Swiss-Prot record:
Name this protein carries in UniProt: Transcription initiation factor IIB
Pfam family, one: Zn_Ribbon_TF
Family statement: Belongs to the TFIIB family.
Function: Stabilizes TBP binding to an archaeal box-A promoter. Also responsible for recruiting RNA polymerase II to the pre-initiation complex (DNA-TBP-TFIIB).
PROSITE patterns per UniProt: TFIIB, ZF_TFIIB
A molecular-function term among this protein's GO annotations: TBP-class protein binding
Length: 300
């Protein structure tokens, strides 16, 4: 918790800021506590929101989610104009929007970022994931990694990579369902991007436990089942049983086992559908975990 600033001379908390001199002064004894403070705000004053808007000379902050980072100018709309003037302004807006994406690279980037917006909106991903995916895509463009690959597959791969980097649990199947490309193509683009952008396995590692709450919510499982599933996964990790295995498959099997142990049974099919894996995968991971961890599962 921050301590209240006091005067070092008399310990009074009555301090005054003098914006003209850039000083903080003690109101009681006149001691100058700080000086040469730079005021980062505007030099003008405003007394309401509309006045602030009129006097402000700066636009919106830069955004990595816009192809031009939001630095271009847009021609606005004014319905009070005459019909002839409105028509003229419409033509100007049309030409101005064309100029903003005048070359192929700009058009491709604008399309890629609109695709990113669509994917992240449908997956309900947080903004920091969207921004990280945009950063990865721009870096891929800068390094010439897009050539020979579809924009959609590379952007979907960047979204998947961003999710893994920021530990936001989303499976490749979920992203492939939203993207307009095949899962295998996204997977190839993901591996290529990860290799060339130095996204090491350590950076991209997602603990299976990160998926537990997501899948358990969809299955309607209690906190008790979740805790048991996490215990199973932690033990599996300690024994090296998770290496090279799909996190989704492992979590599905752990939740299936935990649901049996805690009397909240879910079928292998139900668990497989939520995790977007096959029943065979759930069955195989289930057998491995039960056998290697010596778990005694009640017979239904």
């Amino acid at each position: 918790m921050n301590k209240q600033k006091v005067c070092p001379a008399c310990e009074s908390a009555e301090l005054i800021y003098d914006p003209e001199r850039g000083e903080i002064v003690c109101a009681k004894c006149g001691y100058v506590i700080e000086e040469n403070i730079i005021d980062m705000g505007p030099e003008w004053r405003a007394f309401d929101a509309s006045q602030r808007e009129r006097r402000s000379r700066t636009g919106a902050p830069e955004s990595i989610l816009l192809h031009d980072k939001g630095l271009s100018t847009e021609i606005g709309i004014d319905r009070s104009l005459s019909g002839l003037m409105r028509e003229k302004m419409y033509r100007l807006r049309k030409w101005q929007s064309r100029l903003r994406v005048s070359d192929a690279a700009e058009r491709n980037l604008a399309f890629a970022l609109s695709e990113l917006d669509r994917i992240t909106a449908q997956l309900k991903l947080p903004r920091h994931v969207e921004e990280e995916a945009a950063r990865l895509y721009r870096e891929a463009v800068r390094k010439g990694l897009i050539r020979g690959r579809s924009i959609e597959s590379v952007m979907a791969a960047c979204v998947y990579a961003a999710c893994r980097l920021l530990k936001v649990p989303r499976t490749l199947d979920e992203i492939a369902d939203i993207a307009r490309v095949d899962k295998k193509e996204i997977g190839r683009s993901y591996r290529f991007i990860a290799r060339n952008l130095n996204l090491t396995p350590k950076k991209l590692f997602v603990k299976p436990t990160d998926y537990v709450n997501k899948f358990a919510d969809e299955l309607g499982l209690s906190e008790k089942v979740r805790r048991r599933a996490i215990e199973i996964l932690d033990e599996a990790y300690k024994r090296g049983l998770t290496s090279g295995k799909s996190p989704a498959g492992l979590v599905a099997a752990a939740l299936y086992i935990a649901s049996l142990l805690e009397g909240e049974k879910r079928t292998q099919r139900e668990v497989a559908e939520v995790a977007r894996v096959t029943e065979v995968t759930v069955r195989n991971r289930y057998k491995e975990l039960v056998e290697k961890l010596k778990i005694k599962v009640p017979i239904a």
